[in-house]
Every structure is written in C-alpha cells, then in structure tokens.
C-alpha cells in the first residue's frame, strides 16, 4: 500500500499570475491537503472519503483521480489494476489548489506503486495536463508547488517546468476560505482579452522586483511588490466582502494580501505571529460566510507532496 499526501497551495500570489505559486502548511500541524492511497487489486476501484467527498462527481469517470489513473496507465502502455482511495479534505473551487492536491497525490501514488518509473519532470508534466482538464488550460502554478514544495516560479524553457524561489521564514500566510465556490473557468472568463501597456509594464516591474527581492533577502520590498494589475481588479466582484477585508487586514498589520488562486480564499501575509492571529480572528468573524468556511495560519510547506505510508 502507498499513501501520499499533497499540500494546499496558493497560486498567483498577486504578483505572479499563472507563473508563481506557494505550497502551504498550517502552523498547528493540521494536514491541509488531500491524501490518495493505492493498493494492488484484481480490478480498478475508487473510493471517496473525507470532509468534502460529497462535493465530488457521482460518476466515477468524471473524478479527476480516475482520470489520473487512466492517463498514467496510458503513459505506461498497460492497465494497472489498483484500489484507490481519495481522502478529499480540500474544498472544491476554493483557490487553494484543491484539484492540484488530488492530481498530485494520485499521480505520485501511482508512480510510487509502480516503482518510480517516471521521473519528476515527466510526472509534473502529466500533473499539469490533468489539472488543465479541470481549469481549462495547462498551467503549473498549483501542481508545481504542491508536488515540489516551497515557492515555485514557472519557467517552461530548456526542459525546466518550474524552479524554486527562496521564501522568507518569518512570513505567515493567513488563508481565509469563506465557504463559497468560485470556478477557475468562471474566474478566467471574467478577465479581459487585452491589457493596457502601462498595466503590462507595472506587472513586469512588480514580478521582476519581487523575484529580485526574494533572492536579495529583502522581505519588506518583496511584500510591497505583491500587487495584482492582471486579475484582482476584475475578480474581486466575484468575492463578497473582499475589498473591505483587504483594507481591514492592512490596518491590523498584514504586509500584503490578495486573492489566493482564482478565489474565493483570501491570503494575508504577516511577519509577526500576534499580527497573524489578529488577522485570522478578524477574517474568521467577518469574511467567512457559512459553516464550511475556515481560516488557517500557515507557513511555506517546503517538503511538497510526500509519502505517508509505503
């Protein structure tokens, strides 16, 4: 039996639309991510468990974990009969890389079960392909950090899909999921087809400056440059209370904030534990909309997806 855990991730990080993402893990030790178990069997089966299992498609072939198994078998050129279990702990359409968690855990578990026949680069390429089936286009800003850990910059040149960017140990990521769903496809459809030249220049300056600040170890500058001119101005209308929440967390002391992925989760970066706690308390009282919502104080998950049992 192989059991793999894949952590939540926050894509875009305001400054890097479709090219930046960070894996996150709660400071209290909770597992914020999906778990997939693979066992040898006579025929294929898939069992869904976990807090959000009831939100998964009722037709097994529509389940992304089934599609991962099917695509992995196709890659190897043979059928591999296994019993798979998906522990769906991540809300769907949350902006926390929910589908990436399932895809990464499923493909990594299959690869481990088969003796690591695929290398990490090929496996990551498959992860991007499968994630693209849900979001509508291939992009790696959730699957890469989820699989490899840390903060990842998408490269997609010279056979390199992504590379790690150094993060800051003092940064605490407060993630508030309000309990409503925003589909990635819907959040993409709302974006303009073309952008003004000054917005393109600002975006390039912010992203280049952010990467420079990370490598030159300037956390204050890095946080200051986490601005979004590409997606947030258009997507915030999909998120009730988002603008007020951003203003409130800034007043409390967050050094940066924005939409996690395509939303509705809000992320707020803090550089002090007491500030993070006050931000989390405010968001818990004011940004959550129902019982399915939650707030976690997180750090970067530098390990990425990992085998829990083998």
Swiss-Prot record:
Top enzyme class: transferase
Biological processes annotated in GO: threonine biosynthetic process
Pathway: Amino-acid biosynthesis; L-threonine biosynthesis; L-threonine from L-aspartate: step 4/5
InterPro entries: GHMP_kinase_C_dom (IPR013750), GHMP_kinase_C_sf (IPR036554), GHMP_kinase_N_dom (IPR006204), GHMP_knse_ATP-bd_CS (IPR006203), Homoserine_kinase (IPR000870), Ribosomal_Su5_D2-typ_SF (IPR020568), Ribsml_uS5_D2-typ_fold_subgr (IPR014721)
GO molecular function, one term: ATP binding
Family as reported in the entry's similarity comment: Belongs to the GHMP kinase family. Homoserine kinase subfamily.
PANTHER family per record: HOMOSERINE KINASE, HOMOSERINE/4-DIPHOSPHOCYTIDYL-2-C-METHYL-D-ERYTHRITOL KINASE
Full protein name: Homoserine kinase
Source species of the chain: Escherichia coli O81 (strain ED1a)
Name of the gene this protein is made from: thrB
């Amino acid at each position: 039996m192989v059991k793999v855990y894949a952590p939540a991730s926050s894509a875009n990080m305001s400054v890097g639309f479709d090219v930046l993402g960070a894996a996150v893990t709660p400071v209290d030790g909770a597992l914020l991510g999906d778990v997939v178990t693979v066992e040898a069997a006579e025929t294929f089966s898939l069992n869904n468990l976990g807090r959000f299992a009831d939100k998964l498609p009722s037709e097994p072939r529509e389940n992304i974990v089934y599609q991962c198994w099917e695509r992995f078998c196709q890659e190897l050129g043979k059928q591999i009969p296994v019993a798979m279990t998906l522990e769906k702990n991540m809300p769907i359409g949350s902006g926390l890389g929910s589908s990436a968690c399932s895809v990464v855990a499923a493909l990594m578990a299959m690869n481990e079960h088969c003796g690591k026949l695929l290398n990490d680069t090929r496996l990551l390429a498959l992860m991007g392909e499968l994630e693209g089936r849900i979001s509508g286009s291939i992009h790696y800003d959730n699957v890469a950090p989820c699989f490899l850990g840390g903060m990842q910059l998408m490269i997609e040149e010279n056979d390199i899909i992504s590379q790690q960017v150094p993060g800051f140990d003092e940064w605490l990521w407060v993630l508030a999921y309000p309990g409503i769903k925003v589909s990635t496809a819907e959040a993409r459809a709302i974006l303009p087809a073309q952008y003004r030249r000054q917005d393109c220049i600002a975006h390039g300056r912010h992203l280049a400056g952010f990467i420079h600040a990370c490598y030159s170890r300037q956390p204050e500058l890095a946080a200051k440059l986490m601005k979004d001119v590409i997606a947030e101005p258009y997507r915030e209308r999909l998120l009730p209370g988002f603008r007020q929440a951003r203003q409130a967390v800034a007043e409390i002391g967050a050094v940066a904030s924005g939409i996690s992925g395509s939303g509705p989760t809000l992320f707020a970066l803090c550089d002090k534990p007491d500030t993070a706690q006050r931000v989390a308390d405010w968001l818990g009282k004011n940004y959550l909309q129902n019982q399915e919502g939650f707030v976690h104080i997180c750090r970067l998950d530098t390990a990425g997806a990992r085998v829990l049992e083998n």
